[in-house]
C-alpha cells in the first residue's frame, strides 16, 4: 500500500489508499457512512430524499464517509455492531454508483485487538470501491499508541499516520488527533508543520477537505469534543475559499460553519451518544425499541470540477 501525496488523477493507489486488487488481497476498513458532493470547490449539504442539484457526471468526484463502527463492542444499546456495520456496507454498495473512495473516520474497533482489526478488514473487503482510506480513533490506539492500527491500515503514511492526496481537483488531508490525549484531541507540532508544508504551494481556490476523528472545532470541550491545538491548522486554512472538515467521534450528526470552513460530524454505525451536555457524559445511549437505526448512518459527498461547492448528504441506516 502506497501513501497518498499528490495523486492528481485519482486513478492510482494514492499514498494511503488501496486499489481494488489490493483491497481484495489485504481488505480494508469501515464506519458510520456519509455522502458528500463537492461542486465548484464548496461543500453543499442535502437533506436525505431531496433532489441532488448537481447530477453526477463522469468527471464528478463522489466519495463516502463512514465512522465509528466499534467492532468488538458488546452490550446495550447495540448487541450486534457487526450487523449494523454490515448493513452500512450493504447500503454503500446499493447507492447506485461506485464511490471513488470510502473514508472511515475512526474507531474502526472497540479495543484495537488484532482480531478486531482483521474482522474490520474482512468486512470492508465487500465494498465496491477502488480505494479506502482511514484515520484512527482513540479506540484504535489502546495500549500501543496506535502501532497495531498503523500496521494494519497506515503503512507508508507519515508520522503517526497522517497523509494527504489529491483527486478531481480537491486536496485531501487526513489528520491524527487521537494520540497523546489529555482532555481534548491533539495534533502536535510535527503534524501541524506537515500541514503547513503540505498546503504551501496550493492555490487559494483549491477545495480542501480535512479528515480527523475528533472534531477540529470546539463542539463540547467538557466531553473532550474538540482539539486543543487545531486553531493553528484552521488559521492556515483561512486563505482557501472552501474548506470542509469531516470527523467522527461524537456519534451524531452536527454541522457548524465558521467563515470559509464548514465542519460536519458523522453518524456512527454502532450506537449514538447523547447531545452535548444532555447527560453525565458521552456514553452509549439506549433508544426505544426499533429506533437504533434512526441514529446510525452513512454520508456521501459529491464534487463537480469547475463548480464551487461540496454536496454533503447524510442517510439513515436502512
Regions picked out by a protein language model, each given a short descriptive name:
Residues 26, 42-118, 197:
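N-terminal active-site segment of His-dependent metallophosphoesterases
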Residues 203-219:
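Short acidic, glycine-rich surface-loop motifs adjacent to enzyme active sites
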Residues 49-55, 113-207, 229-244, 256-267, ...:
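Extended active-site neighborhood of metal-dependent phosphoesterases/phosphodiesterases
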